Amino acid sequence: LVFALTPFLAMNAFREFSEIVSLLQPVAGAHPAIAHFLQQPDAERLSELFASLLNMQGEEKSRALAILKSALDSQQGEPWQTIRLISEFYPEDSGLFSPLLLNVVKLNPGEAMFLFAETPHAYLQGVALEVMANSDNVLRAGLTPKYIDIPELVANVKFEAKPANKLLTQPVKQGAELDFPIPVDDFAFSLHDLSDKETTISQQSAAILFCVEGDATLCKGSQQLQLKPGESAFIAANESPVTVKGHGRLARVYNKL
């Protein structure tokens, strides 16, 4: 899960195939795999296209990027503006084609989206709070000078579309608590509005409390801990419940046991 603290720009999941076809038209001549996908837009061709773009080297890569950058002169709006942005930092990276394949998502502060396993994503601009489930791997897919294991990456990616309008998490408000539904059991995430009145926060698991804005005072017996924006506290399972008060908002990560 990624929760935006500032305006946040990211890419997440493959676009609808029909949308990819439309966006690839201006760069159809950049690589044979693009033409193949345009002729037969399905998961298999998308897999081949994804791998082919990442595997480009030398003259083949230079030519493809030149065609892409030439298209920027005549194309406006998204995702072309995002390509312009990342080209300032990674001008020779094959990942510049990624916004044509992946959803470009703009989160406003307070909005969140879930990042599914085996689904490409990238954080491009802004500050956010990220919560990760236990994972034993991270596979790079571009926009980095580091090594990319392309065969392993392709073997672990699901080449299926996820509509952009379904990526944002729809929170449910319960009093002063805003609960963000998570489609896995690994963790839970909620946001709490604070006031001068003490509120009890309780869970059966350990928890992390993060001050999003304002100030928060945590109380447990005679002990008090004040959090300012950007500060967090770990609450052991045997320390629950605690009371909180203050002004602003507090994010909570825990397990629903």
Name each model feature, range by range.
Residues 1-11, 126-145, 187, 247-257:
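A short hydrophobic beta-strand segment most commonly corresponding to one strand
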Residues 1-12, 16-18, 76, 80-84, ...:
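Glycine- and acidic-residue-biased ligand/ion/polar-headgroup-sensing regions
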